[in-house]
Amino acid sequence: MPIIKSAIERVKTNNKANVRNTAQMSAMRTAVKKFEAAKTAGADNVDDLYLAATSAVDKAASKGLIKRNKAARDKSRMAARYAK
């Protein structure tokens, strides 16, 4: 455990950021999985789920949770899947 006050504060800050980042990554993954499942099942709301998934990927990239190249790759794969 840290002894210096600033180190204690950094541990608290890092824990808060970790919780926030984990939640946003989970939400992004869930949105992508919902789109994939709906596309496979041939659901009616595929359009809305596609927009939600691409938005979630863009948001994760803008927050620095994933790299821009991974975001572009994921969106490209979803777009190809959406077009089929």
UniProtKB/Swiss-Prot annotation:
Pfam families: Ribosomal_S20p (PF01649). The keyword Ribonucleoprotein applies. GO terms for cellular component: cytosol; small ribosomal subunit. It comes from the Bacteria. GO terms for biological process: translation. Keywords: Ribonucleoprotein, Ribosomal protein, RNA-binding, rRNA-binding. GO terms for molecular function: small ribosomal subunit rRNA binding; structural constituent of ribosome. InterPro entries: Ribosomal_bS20, Ribosomal_bS20_sf. Belongs to the bacterial ribosomal protein bS20 family. Binds directly to 16S ribosomal RNA. This is Small ribosomal subunit protein bS20. The gene is rpsT.
